[in-house]
């Protein structure tokens, strides 16, 4: 992604011109000092219109747009949203709604981080319970997926407990920074997320697999997503970020990032009532997930590897839960 050295007002001019009456801010990794080519612009647009998040490309710049109301900025409904606003960097703020919201949310940053961490930790416990249930039923594919999903929930809970807002494309960098003196925490995530398969080939295969999932979502309006929230630009952004990470030999980071993307995509495919399990997506004559695609996504661990990762992750989740108790 070129041109990152230019001022944000210059790079984001198409967005500023399109939403002329809106306050605009940078959020996400760019706003938090991770100004790297593999970090797209996450842009907060304050508007009265209720619009779904979207991705777009203009020139050599990729951007993910999140549309919010003034009330969402001043009084966010969720702790993680509060943290995101608190750490935002205004690009245009003529009405001072962003400045006011940032100040208000900074004042409660620690409380918001604590609540957000607790919510993610609770989610991790619930998801790991699904993984255990799947193992008991010998549904190995489901167990592999839910272990992967639980690993990311744990990682986010861990970062949020440190008042760090997770950045999926640079998650490992963030985890390494906060794991000094607590290597077992990082090891628990690594084993649960299957990072032993990380490498140039693994990242490339997973990227190809996730791209297929994006195509499947766009072809199926019954997922409730489709082209509106999964535009081609979203896939292009993903590919550009992955290419940059591979070029910089950040292969584990790339593989980790693809992991979160495949979780999001599969959950979108699971949304229809008839698709309650990964196995349901991978069986029958109309199966969406073939054996080759499953291997590309890295969802091919055996039961022993899954149990080992699950035990390691559960131990670290328990440690974080005990440490987080008042």
What are these regions (language model features)?
Residues 1-39, 44-92, 291-293:
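Metal-dependent nucleotidyltransferase catalytic core
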Residues 1-5, 97-108, 210-214:
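Generic hydrophobic, helix-prone segments enriched in Leu/Val/Ile
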Residues 8-9, 27-28, 40, 108-111, ...:
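Generic preference for well-ordered secondary structure
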Residues 9-10, 18, 30, 47, ...:
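Residue-identity detector for threonine
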Residues 14-19, 94-96, 121, 137:
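Short acidic/polar alpha-helix capping motifs at helix-coil junctions
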Residues 70-132:
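Internal, well-ordered alpha/beta segment that forms a basic, Gly-enriched binding/recognition surface
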Residues 116-326:
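Conserved nucleotidyltransferase catalytic core and NTase-mimicking acidic/glycine-rich helix/loop elements
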């Amino acid at each position: 992604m070129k041109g990152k050295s230019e001022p944000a007002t210059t790079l984001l001019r198409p967005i500023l011109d399109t939403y002329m009456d809106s306050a605009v801010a940078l959020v996400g990794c760019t706003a938090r000092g991770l100004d790297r080519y593999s970090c797209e612009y996450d842009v907060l647009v304050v508007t009265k219109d209720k619009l779904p998040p979207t991705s777009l490309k203009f020139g050599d710049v990729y951007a993910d747009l999140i549309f919010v109301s003034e009330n969402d900025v001043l009084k966010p409904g969720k702790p993680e949203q509060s943290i995101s606003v608190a750490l935002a960097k205004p690009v245009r703020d003529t009405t001072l709604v962003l400045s006011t919201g940032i100040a208000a949310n900074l004042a409660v940053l620690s409380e918001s981080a604590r609540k957000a961490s607790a919510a993610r930790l609770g989610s991790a416990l619930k998801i790991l319970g699904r993984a255990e249930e799947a193992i008991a039923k010998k549904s190995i594919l489901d167990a592999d997926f839910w272990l992967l999903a639980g690993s990311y929930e744990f990682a986010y809970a861990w970062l949020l407990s440190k008042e760090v807002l997770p950045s999926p494309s640079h998650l490992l960098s963030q985890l390494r920074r906060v794991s000094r003196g607590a290597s077992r925490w990082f090891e628990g995530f690594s084993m649960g997320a299957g990072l032993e398969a990380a490498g140039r080939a693994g990242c490339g295969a997973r990227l190809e697999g996730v791209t297929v999932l994006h195509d499947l979502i766009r072809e199926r309006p019954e997922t409730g997503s489709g082209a509106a929230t999964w535009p081609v630009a979203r896939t292009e952004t993903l590919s550009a970020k992955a290419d940059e990470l591979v070029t910089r030999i950040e292969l584990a980071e790339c593989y980790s990032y693809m992991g979160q993307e495949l979780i999001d995509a599969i959950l979108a495919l699971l949304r229809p009532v008839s698709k309650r399990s990964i196995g349901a997506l991978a069986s029958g004559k109309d199966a969406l997930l073939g054996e080759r695609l499953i291997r590309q996504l890295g969802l091919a661990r055996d039961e022993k590897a899954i149990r080992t990762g699950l035990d390691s992750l559960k131990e670290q989740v328990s440690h974080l839960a005990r440490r987080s108790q008042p």
